[in-house]
Amino acid sequence: LSDFPSRNATCISISRGPDGEEAFWVGTYDSGLFRRRGRGWEAFGAEQGFPSTSIYCLLANPDGRPSFWAGTRGAGLVAVDPAGWRTLPDHPGIASRQANCFLETQGPGGERVFWIGTDKGLVRWDARGPAMETSAHGLPGEFVTDLLEVRTPAGPEIWASTIGGIARRRGDRWEA
């Protein structure tokens, strides 16, 4: 792997294309996104029209669809699939275009819920749209660095690490 074109790798993921072929993806701090299928690297950066050169996190779709999400600085969350990429539209409920981390969970009715950690709090995006959660909601810090879902006998919990400490969400409440 000494042929990797950047020294600033930030995250890795594997996706499966429509033909079933696996692709290895690497996000970088300053050079965009790279894909490896077989030998050699294919770049997705400013020259290729990718919306950000700073990739902070990657998440393959858990349902096996040939797409994944890239969390970026400046473009927020970007959906990447065989047809190309698209950014989530600006929304007044989101205070930042920096996606440091994210997590996909299921809501009480089985619906998809996205949690996006930003430098200005945590976005919870469900069927109703996005809602920003900050220290006013119980998070110990605004800059969210990582997210984890933990299944417990009492139900699922979301854990968040922030610059300021960690917090656990049970139901609709954060505990720091």
Residue ranges of each PLM-predicted region?
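Carboxylate-rich, polar loop motifs that coordinate divalent cations or form catalytic acidic clusters
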Residues: L1-A176
